[in-house]
Amino acid sequence: MPENSKLRQKVDPLTFKITAANHVLTNIAKKLPKNIAEKNNLELHVQEFLFFASGAIEVIKREINSRFEIFDKENVFYIYGLKKRLLDDGIQGKIKETISNYFSTPEYNYELDTKNSSLWRLQTLRNQAMHGNIIKIIRNKLHFKYTIRADKERVIIFVESTENPYRYFKQLFDELCNFIIKTKKIMNPNYKIKIKPLQI
């Protein structure tokens, strides 16, 4: 059996997903691409990162569901639906609040509020990547476009830009790790974090 296959059998799915996301994150450039080859390379590594990072969310989402038996394990469900079905008190209430602190849709009330939306943005980028390329460079900056519905009549599009792709996705990765740690510790106060470098 190849050495990589042996390694993957030794770690739990969540640890593997988050470790893989961290591994491919290091391949994301810290500068904007200068030519089409570098742009394609950046697209590749960003999509790899989003794949594994979203996979980690999928794993912990199903761990939460298994703990509280909210949905049938065979059903397809989203973290927003899970949050809606969680109770407002006790351990479920704490997990519900933690989900809200990371997955809330940005709110617009004269000003845009995205402070509780880091993993909403991550999942939005993953959805965009499933339907096409997401690397768009405009005026020497990398642009990411997000769409929200402000009310029944207004749709708001906002853009985040960066000159350092690695830093942008490192911030999302850090938020993902924080969410995982907080959620796991709510369910198991003795949980020992396993996010560390592994050979992949």
Regions found by a protein language model. Give the residues of each.
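Acidic, Ser/Thr/Gly/Pro-rich intrinsically disordered interaction regions
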Residues: 1-23, 27-51, 59-200
